[in-house]
């Protein structure tokens, strides 16, 4: 069973949720055997079967080495990060992480300003403070402040819907 958060000794505290799940408790329901794994670890294991035309290159040549590492990144209620790597014998290993908790590192003056704005609200600004559902709202509000405009949007889904309906709107820009 794949769940959001780090698995420790067969137990997991779900990320962004008060729930705790354990293999032992699930086995009392008659589920045997039970193995809990991180949701992005599961996605890393599945990455090699994703059709090539469904993948996006984030740098380097479009046709990379088929034996190279595969990064899996994805926003949701948080920002998931994992990788599928191969050892020197060619054996695959899925490497889950809590990479969404890494600090946001601005790359230009606008991102510097976004960080400055978010630091007024948060002691520490991680990647998932920007890239996930709730993070989308943080980013939208920061960009509105930078642009000197008001935003009355309180729902990340509304930002997405507005951007899809009008790519030239502040939500889509």
Where are these regions (language model features)?
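Short acidic/glycine-rich loops and adjacent helix/strand connectors
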Residues: 24-33, 97, 118-120, 138, ...
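Glycine-rich phosphate-binding loop of actin/hexokinase-like ATP-binding domains
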Residues: 59-128
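Residues on a specific face of well-ordered alpha-helices
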Residues: 24, 28, 42, 79, ...
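Conserved active-site and cofactor/substrate-binding residues in soluble primary-metabolism enzymes
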Residues: 21, 109, 113, 131-134, ...
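A mobile "lid/hinge" subdomain adjacent to the ATP/sugar-phosphate binding pocket shared
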Residues: 121-173
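ATP-dependent carbohydrate kinase catalytic cores
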Residues: 35-64, 154-173
């Amino acid at each position: 069973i794949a769940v959001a958060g780090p698995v420790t000794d067969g137990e997991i505290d779900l990320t962004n949720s008060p729930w705790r799940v354990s293999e032992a408790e699930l086995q009392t329901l008659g589920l045997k055997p039970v193995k809990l794994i991180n949701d992005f670890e599961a996605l890393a294991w599945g990455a090699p079967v994703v059709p090539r035309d469904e993948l996006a290159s984030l740098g380097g040549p479009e046709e990379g080495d088929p034996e190279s590492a595969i990064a899996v990144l994805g926003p949701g209620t948080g920002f998931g990060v994992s990788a599928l790597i191969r050892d020197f014998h060619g054996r695959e290993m899925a490497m889950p992480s809590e990479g969404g908790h890494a600090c946001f590192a601005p790359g230009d003056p606008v991102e510097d300003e976004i960080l400055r704005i978010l630091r007024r609200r948060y002691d520490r600004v991680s990647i998932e403070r920007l890239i996930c559902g709730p993070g989308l709202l943080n980013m939208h509000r920061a960009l509105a402040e930078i642009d000197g405009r008001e935003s009355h949007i309180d729902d990340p889904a509304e930002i997405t819907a507005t951007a899809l309906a009008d790519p030239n709107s502040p939500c889509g820009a």
